[in-house]
Amino acid sequence: MLTVLQRVKEARVDIDGQTVGKINHGLLILCGFEPNDSLENIKRMLDKCINYRIFEDPSGKMNLSLKDVNGGLLLVPQFTLMADTQKGLRPSFSNAASPELGRELFDNLLTLAQKCHQNTQSGCFGANMQVYLCNDGPVTFLLQF
């Protein structure tokens, strides 16, 4: 599993002109899944992201987590993160989980996130989404599980 974790001032996901997920101050997480990903991977990733100290404390040091700042969490599935770009001029997606497995893993992630973090929003697996964000910092991390 590969995730892009972005600290945002605000973010939203639109599908066909309708907003399906929106947060203010918080985290936008783009998620790509591999065939060998499991529920355990998802739990580890979610725990790390929610508790990762990337928000500034009063002295300006990155010392606070999403839970500490009571921020929003916006989860967006993005299978293109799993692209192999080493050869040629066209990406290969052979490293990505199948659409069926990817949907199952994303649904599990969303369910777990909603149970442990009240302000959780999401995009829609398999949809053509427009993602709007105001990156705060910018602060962006690439996490692999």
From Swiss-Prot:
Gene3D superfamilies: D-tyrosyl-tRNA(Tyr) deacylase (3.50.80.10). A Gly-cisPro motif from one monomer fits into the active site of the other monomer to allow specific chiral rejection of L-amino acids. GO terms for molecular function: D-tyrosyl-tRNA(Tyr) deacylase activity; Gly-tRNA(Ala) deacylase activity; Ser(Gly)-tRNA(Ala) hydrolase activity; tRNA binding. The lineage of its organism: Bacteria, Pseudomonadati, Pseudomonadota, Gammaproteobacteria, Legionellales. GO terms for biological process: D-amino acid catabolic process. Homodimer. An aminoacyl-tRNA editing enzyme that deacylates mischarged D-aminoacyl-tRNAs. Also deacylates mischarged glycyl-tRNA(Ala), protecting cells against glycine mischarging by AlaRS. Acts via tRNA-based rather than protein-based catalysis; rejects L-amino acids rather than detecting D-amino acids in the active site. By recycling D-aminoacyl-tRNA to D-amino acids and free tRNA molecules, this enzyme counteracts the toxicity associated with the formation of D-aminoacyl-tRNA entities in vivo and helps enforce protein L-homochirality. It comes from the Bacteria. This is D-aminoacyl-tRNA deacylase. It comes from Legionella pneumophila (strain Lens). The keyword Ribonucleoprotein does not apply. It holds the Pfam family Tyr_Deacylase. InterPro entries: Daa-tRNA_deacyls_DTD (IPR003732), DTD-like_sf (IPR023509).
